[in-house]
């Protein structure tokens, strides 16, 4: 066949009058347009256009197709798409050519844009709709169901979503994939709920529904009625269904709010509360087992159902989860006490309370949830130094240490809790009420009434602790009566009590979006003159917007447009709470705009910080978004950039984030370094030097910063807190803003946001305790007991091992003080030494060479030993129940126990219900290590976690209680 060098002959046929010749010309041009498009475009494009628009011409669609291909080769995609739509069926979506594939992507993008447009008058071209539907048909024919599902989700086509899942042939896999995509990619809350509704219906239509996934969808939909119905039906069936019901209960407690759990329990049949004769129990789990595990289930009958129902209620209340976590954290506590003692020693060398408070906070975080207060009891004299608000922080730290010890909370704090009226120790009493809130955070049914009672005592300092405690205990309950009680405290117009009341009102109404609360809080924020109160109300308003997404936009616009920078500050957190984890572009755009344009440093700092919340589900994107802001001339922006990285990349050990943070640790401004240290610890929490080499380096940097006399005090405070964060919960807890199933971790999000307010008020540091999640897998049998079982971790133990303990310093304290030498003595020694200098030079040189040789030999020996140890290290290890498993270790876990298998297909961190494969054999249970709770005397050093009577209180100390220092007189500052 002769090669064609030109299409001029075909183009000339377009001038003929006969339609057949014109049609023939277009057919030939269509076959070679990709090669001769430039010649066609330069001479005959207008002629082809006239044929395209002439509907009387039989080949007008072919003319449009030729034009589309010409414009495609000219890279004029809008015109190419326009004429492709006019080509009708000639634009064959089944074709695999580059032209078809490219325009299909363009058409799909345009279709998605039109489908998601907020303009109600938007009309979609029927030809465009036809092409996209053809694309869906092509996907179904080729078996590309996931591709069709992805396009359907982006285009918001619910009918195609349902069709893609139901026709896929692997419905369960597609349902899981759709749920994941829905949580990660769908920004519109209303549409996401519509998709979740379809998933629930498709799940329930299966022969064997996956009730675990169904309940996850129902939690997102806030449908407690359907959840209760499923639970009730499951506990009436066989043992397999019972285990599934218990597992669903544990997942509900982990992923839903207090109010949702209460609603579910109210829909279940009630159970009679049994009186407990035993009062000196251990954690909540022990008392629970005494009540409900007194015997095996009876076969059939109402007693068996009642026992199952009682256990289900205990799971939903949280007694089992909290008790098991307490047991795990207590028995596995691996806190390095040398670090704490070193910090305490260093704090004694510094004036002021900042380092002293930092050590208290670090100790609380290191022992969070472990119930171990050994460090406090062994340093009583040091604790006696605390006065006023430092004493408040010291007592409230017990709440972090004993987090979750709900059964014995009042006994633990009995020494400090207030009576019917205020005595001479309001700071201790207020701190104890705050501690109660920290112990009962998001689980405060038993303590709320007590805190309300103390809220009625007329004392501003007591109101502060009681308000914070009540807000934490009643978090997200949405109770109007508690809101009104706190509002009455707010209206006292006192800065101390108002600061706590504003935050507490937001915590109680967390995520409710209540219009009444918004109007009242915003109005009072504009009326009051107290900056503390305005700021706390702004944060409270942000709490109300938790998870509201687009519904929060009206309030957000109102807050960020306010003249008061304190309200704009709260507006940044309103964006963070409304869009946490969504990666929403509009939210990020607003935050970035404020970060570079607002005239107030605190607002800019908050805006940059809140980027971390929005990107918390996509940590890999945060370093890129923050990189330039971390180099800003404004130190407040750099501070915010550091915390944004810490929040978004918490527990990931991400190297890009660590590189930016490492550069910020050498910043010239103390508080920027403070943020960098803390954020570095957040990123490196639960990582080992084998997995992330920077983990070991970071610990050394923290220690160096603390011991360096020239280091800024704010930087040192950050390094102290960093040690507390990186070793949190006895090195058995991590920071997770989202659960593996995609749910937001409400406690963690609120905890970190509250913790960040330590910039203004140090006691808010304790909120970090809320953000900590135990990293454990705890297996339970049908009686909610821990059986002895093991599973395999298919990786080297060192990858996820505890960091080695630091060695105590052997340097004596006298070495720190140099002997004073007079100048004339130094001169005499210098003159006498010069004569012997030449002789000594050779000796010194020889000694130096010998020293270097020894150091080299020692280094080689260490390397050989390390290599030898690495060779001997096993490739896997067996883990025993309850086991420490960090999030990144889950992928290596294999459940291969001969007797017990998890009811879940892919168990996550937390409590796992176990199926007993040999139920007729006797079970061996794990022996509890937690000692009985008893009140200890001052001199008792038994090591029990409840010997709090030995902690400092104003009624037992020898130092007098000093009055609170008065406010300085007004003055004018002139440079």
UniProtKB/Swiss-Prot annotation:
InterPro entries: 26S_Psome_Rpn2, ARM-like, ARM-type_fold, Proteasome/cyclosome_rpt, PSMD1_RPN2_N, RPN2_C. Residues 272-303, 832-882, 922-975 are annotated as: Disordered. GO terms for cellular component: autophagosome; lysosome; nucleus; proteasome regulatory particle, base subcomplex; proteasome storage granule. Keywords: Proteasome, Repeat. This is 26S proteasome non-ATPase regulatory subunit 1. Acts as a regulatory subunit of the 26 proteasome which is involved in the ATP-dependent degradation of ubiquitinated proteins. Residues 944-961 have a biased composition (Low complexity). Belongs to the proteasome subunit S1 family. It comes from Dictyostelium discoideum. Residues 842-880, 926-935 have a biased composition (Basic and acidic residues). One of its GO terms (molecular function) is enzyme regulator activity. One of its GO terms (biological process) is proteasome-mediated ubiquitin-dependent protein catabolic process.
């Amino acid at each position: 066949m002769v090669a064609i060098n030109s299409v001029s002959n075909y183009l000339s046929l377009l001038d003929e009058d006969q339609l057949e010749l014109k049609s023939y010309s277009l057919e030939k041009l269509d076959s070679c347009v990709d090669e001769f498009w430039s010649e066609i475009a330069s001479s005959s494009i207008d002629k082809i256009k006239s044929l395209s628009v002439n509907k009387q011409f039989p080949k007008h669609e072919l003319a449009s197709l030729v034009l589309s291909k010409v414009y495609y080769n000219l890279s004029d995609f809008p015109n190419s798409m326009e004429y492709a739509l006019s080509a009708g069926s000639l634009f064959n979506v089944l074709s695999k050519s580059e032209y078809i594939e490219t325009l299909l992507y363009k058409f799909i993008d345009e279709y998605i844009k039109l489908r998601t447009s907020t303009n109600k008058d938007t009309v979609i071209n029927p030809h465009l709709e036809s092409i996209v539907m053809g694309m869906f048909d092509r996907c179904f024919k080729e078996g590309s169901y996931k591709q069709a599902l992805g396009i359907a989700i982006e285009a918001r086509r619910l009918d195609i979503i349902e069709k893609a899942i139901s026709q896929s042939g692997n419905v369960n896999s597609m349902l899981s994939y759709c749920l994941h995509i829905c949580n990660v990619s769908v920004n519109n809350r209303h549409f996401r709920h519509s998709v979740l509704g379809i998933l629930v219906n498709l799940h329930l239509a299966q022969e064997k529904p996956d009730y675990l996934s169904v309940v996850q969808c129902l939690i997102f939909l806030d449908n407690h009625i359907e959840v209760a119905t499923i639970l009730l039906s499951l506990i009436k069936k066989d043992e397999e269904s019972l285990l599934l019901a218990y597992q669903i209960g544990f997942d509900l407690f982990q992923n839903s709010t207090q109010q949702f759990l209460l609603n579910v329990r109210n829909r279940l049949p009630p159970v009679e509360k049994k009186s407990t004769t035993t009062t000196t129990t251990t954690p909540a789990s022990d008392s629970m087992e005494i009540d409900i595990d007194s015997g095996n289930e009876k076969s059939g009958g109402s007693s068996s159902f009642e026992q199952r129902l009682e256990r289900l209620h205990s799971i939903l209340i949280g007694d089992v989860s909290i008790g098991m976590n307490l047991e795990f954290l207590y028995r596995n506590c691996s806190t390095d006490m040398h670090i704490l003692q070193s910090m305490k020693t260093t704090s004694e060398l510094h004036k002021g309370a900042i380092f002293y408070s930092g050590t208290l906070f670090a100790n609380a975080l290191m022992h969070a949830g472990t119930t171990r207060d050994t460090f406090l009891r062994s340093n009583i004299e040091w604790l006696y130094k605390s006065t006023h608000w430092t004493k408040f922080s010291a007592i409230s730290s017990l709440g972090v240490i004993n987090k979750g010890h709900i059964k014995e909370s009042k006994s633990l704090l009995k020494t400090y809790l207030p009576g019917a009226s205020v005595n001479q120790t309001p700071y201790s009493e207020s701190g104890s009420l705050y501690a109660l809130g920290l112990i009962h955070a998001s689980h405060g049914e038993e303590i709320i009434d007590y805190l309300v009672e103390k809220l009625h005592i007329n004392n501003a300092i007591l109101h502060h602790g009681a308000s914070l405690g009540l807000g934490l205990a009643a978090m997200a309950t949405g109770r109007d009566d508690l809101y009104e009680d706190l509002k009455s405290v707010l209206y006292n117009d006192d800065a101390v009590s108002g600061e706590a009341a504003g935050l507490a009102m937001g915590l109680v109404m967390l995520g409710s979006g209540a219009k009444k609360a918004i109007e009242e809080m915003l109005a009072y924020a504009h009326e009051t003159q107290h900056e503390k109160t305005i700021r706390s109300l702004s944060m409270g308003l942000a709490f109300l917007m938790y998870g509201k997404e687009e519904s929060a936009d009206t309030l957000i616009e109102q807050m960020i447009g306010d003249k008061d920078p304190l309200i704009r500050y709260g507006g940044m957190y309103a964006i963070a709470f409304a869009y946490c984890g969504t990666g929403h572009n509009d939210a990020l755009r607003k935050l970035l705009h404020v970060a570079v344009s607002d005239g107030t440093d605190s607002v800019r700092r908050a805006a940059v910080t809140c980027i971390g919340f929005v990107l918390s589900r996509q940590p890999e994107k945060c370093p890129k978004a923050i990189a330039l802001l971390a180099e800003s001339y404004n130190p407040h922006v750099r501070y915010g950039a550091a915390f944004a990285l810490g929040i978004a990349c918490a527990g990931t050990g991400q190297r890009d984030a660590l590189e930016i943070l490492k550069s910020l640790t050498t910043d010239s401004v103390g508080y920027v370094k403070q943020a960098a240290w803390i954020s570095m610890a957040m990123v490196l929490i639960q990582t080992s030097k084998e997995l992330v080499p920077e983990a070991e380096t970071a610990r050394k940097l923290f220690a160096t910063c603390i011991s360096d006399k020239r280091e800024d005090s704010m930087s040192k405070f950050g390094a102290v807190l960093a040690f507390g964060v990186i070793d949190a919960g006895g090195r058995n807890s991590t920071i997770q803003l989202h659960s593996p199933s995609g749910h937001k971790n409400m406690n963690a999000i609120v905890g970190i946001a509250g913790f960040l307010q330590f910039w203004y008020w140090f006691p808010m540091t304790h909120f970090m305790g809320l953000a900590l999640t135990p990293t454990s897998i705890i297996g339970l049998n049908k009686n909610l007991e821990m059986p002895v079982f093991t599973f395999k971790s298919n990786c080297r133990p060192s990858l996820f091992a505890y960091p080695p303990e630091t060695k105590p310093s052997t340097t004596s304290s006298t070495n720190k003080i140099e002997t004073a030498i007079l100048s004339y003595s130094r001169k005499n020694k210098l003159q006498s030494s010069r004569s012997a200098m030449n002789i000594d030079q050779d000796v010194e040189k020889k000694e130096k060479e010998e020293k270097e040789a020894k150091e080299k030999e020692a280094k080689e020996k260490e390397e050989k030993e390390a290599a030898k140890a690495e060779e001997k290290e096993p490739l896997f290890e067996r883990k025993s129940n309850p086991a420490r498993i960090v999030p990144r270790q889950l992928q290596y876990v294999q459940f291969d126990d001969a007797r017990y298998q998890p009811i879940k297909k892919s168990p996550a961190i937390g409590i796992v219900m176990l199926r007993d494969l040999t139920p007729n054999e006797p079970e061996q249970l794990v022996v509890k290590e937690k000692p009985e709770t008893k009140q200890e005397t001052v001199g008792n050093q038994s090591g029990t976690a409840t010997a709090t009577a030995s902690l400092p209180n104003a009624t037992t100390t020898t130092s007098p209680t000093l009055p609170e220092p008065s406010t300085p007189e007004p003055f004018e500052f002139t440079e």
